[in-house]
């Protein structure tokens, strides 16, 4: 999950990177399609604020504890 935490943190702080992420190559990020869907779901549901004031890494990992979200990864 550490790599997902880092990706989310990077996307939150770089709006241009988010657009590239939605349309880009996943192999460079070391994630699979399901992980990409889970991250996009987080943004679409408003769970990830588009600001640099994101909570600690633990909060990001906790996001994926929800059953519906777990099913995405």
UniProtKB/Swiss-Prot annotation:
Q: Which UniProt keywords apply?
A: Competence, Lipoprotein, Pheromone, Prenylation, Secreted
Post-translational modification (record): Trp-54 is modified by farnesylation, which is essential for activity. Modified by the tryptophan prenyltransferase ComQ before export to the extracellular environment.
Q: Where in the cell is it found?
A: Secreted
Cite a single GO BP annotation.
establishment of competence for transformation
**Residues linked to a lipid group, 3'-farnesyl-2',N2-cyclotryptophan type:** 54
**Assembly notes:** Interacts directly with the sensor histidine kinase ComP and stimulates its activity.
One of the record's GO cellular component terms: extracellular region
**Pfam families from the UniProt entry:** ComX
User: Mind telling me which residues form the propeptide?
Assistant: 1-52, 59-73
Function text: Part of a major quorum-sensing system that regulates the development of genetic competence. Acts through the activation of the two-component regulatory system ComP/ComA composed of a sensor histidine kinase, ComP, and a response regulator, ComA. Activates the expression of the genes for biosynthesis of poly-gamma-glutamic acid (gamma-PGA), which is involved in biofilm formation in B.subtilis natto.
Q: Is Transferase found in the keyword set?
A: no
Question: Where does this protein come from, organism-wise?
Answer: Bacillus subtilis subsp. natto (strain BEST195)
Predominant location category: secreted
- Protein name per UniProt: ComX pheromone
* Gene Ontology MF annotations: pheromone activity
What sections of the protein cross the membrane? none
The cross-references to InterPro entries, in alphabetical order and at most eight, read:
Competence_ComX_Bacillus
- Superkingdom of origin organism: Bacteria
Lineage here is: Bacteria, Bacillati, Bacillota, Bacilli, Bacillales
């Amino acid at each position: 999950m550490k790599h997902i935490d880092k990706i989310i943190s990077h996307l939150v702080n770089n709006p241009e990177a988010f657009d590239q992420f939605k349309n880009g190559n996943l192999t460079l990020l070391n994630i699979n399609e399901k992980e990409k869907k889970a991250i996009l779901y987080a943004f679409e549901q408003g769970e990830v604020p588009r600001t640099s004031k994101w909570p600690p890494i633990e909060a990001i990992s906790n996001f994926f504890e929800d059953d519906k979200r777990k099913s995405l990864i």
